[in-house]
Amino acid sequence: IWLLGVIGFGLLAGIIPLHGWVPQAHANASAPAAALFSTVVMKIGLLGILTLSLLGGNAPLWWGVALLVLGMITAFVGGLYALMEHNIQRLLAYHTLENIGIILLGLGAGVTGIALNQPVLIALGLTGGLYHLLNHSLFKSVLFLGAGSIWFRTGHRDIEKLGGIGKRMPVISIAMLVGLMAMAALPPLNGFAGEWVIYQSF
């Protein structure tokens, strides 16, 4: 039952290899809809996986290991796809996949801690995962709404065609810069905080 639940919720969360809908849905949706996909819909899938893992009785070790492996694959592949992308909304979608993987690493560490009866691992993994889930939702909303504003003003989503946007849209550009710095996990911004807690669990 747990495995079937992970497949179902993993499809909703966009965990690789169940991510096929994510880039197209984000690239073709309006900016507010894309922001909702990234910050609400996909996160519900992660919370569903966590709920299954916590309420499924004594979590065996392989549950945690499976979540860790899926998290590593999703984070790595999502980051690679993001590096090759020029459509700004599709790039943000692939970066969302990377962060879904990072959050899943935290949740997987917490579930592994439950199986091994390690309170520190449980606390760091679950706290880091949930904290980064919240932080990612905040800065990714800013980025998708900023990308939508840029597309509305310029008619372009191709990053290569957005040169000089800082002069045309200074306020949006500053907001996007802050969001991008958080996305890059630069301290002291919120993108750094959750990832730091997750990394402490390893």
Enumerate the language-model features and the residues they cover.
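Hydrophobic transmembrane alpha-helices and their helix-loop junctions in integral membrane proteins
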Residues: 1-202
